[in-house]
Design a protein with these regions (language model features):
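Conserved PLP-enzyme active-site core in the AAT-like
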Residues: 1-169
Length: 174
């Protein structure tokens, strides 16, 4: 997706290119029109909803449907959906990732990510994670648990602030 988180774009443009893998970016509001971007060699449809830069929400079910019709795996960066507000696997996404640093940990003192997959892709995800040496230290796990204890309170405050912001914006435009 075109509004993808900058380090993800850099990964595609700098590292994947070196491995002979090409990336095609598409507008986040493409929806079912994603079929026009799928090529015979497309392996993964990467979504980010809401998007990091513009907060645009993608039509995930429509895009997953098209991807499935073309035998393309779907992966969604669910950092802002955080698993409580949006559950990608329930909408057909194959792999969901998120930066645990943001909402799960919540204190910016741990660098951590989370990946979950459906039954089809879980064995591959688990094995590749192991082969790449990805693991969490005991200290980071402890700090993540600390963040989980306050996550509900923090997200409730985020929600209240967002509603107030929208209400205030509507009043100022009336």
């Amino acid at each position: 997706v075109d509004n993808v988180y900058e380090p993800t774009r850099d990964f595609c443009d700098k590292i994947l290119v070196g491995l002979g893998i090409t990336t095609t970016y598409y507008p986040p509001t493409t929806g079912a029109g994603i079929k026009d971007y799928i090529q015979p060699n497309t392996k993964v449809l990467f979504l980010e909803s809401p998007g990091s830069i513009t907060m645009e929400v993608q039509d995930v079910p429509a895009m997953v449907k098209v991807a499935n019709e073309h035998n393309v795996m779907t992966m969604l960066d669910n950092t802002y959906g955080n698993g409580l507000h949006y559950r990608p696997l329930e909408h057909g996404v194959d792999i969901s990732i998120q930066a645990a640093t943001k909402y799960i940990v919540g204190h910016s003192d741990v660098m951590m990510g989370v990946a979950v997959a459906n039954k089809k892709y879980w064995p591959t995800l688990r094995e590749n994670s192991y082969l790449l040496g990805q693991c969490t230290s005991a200290d980071d796990a402890y700090l993540a648990l600390r963040g989980l204890r306050t996550m509900g309170v923090r997200l409730n405050q985020h929600e209240k602030a967002a509603i107030k912001s929208k209400t205030d914006a509507k009043k100022s435009h009336s």
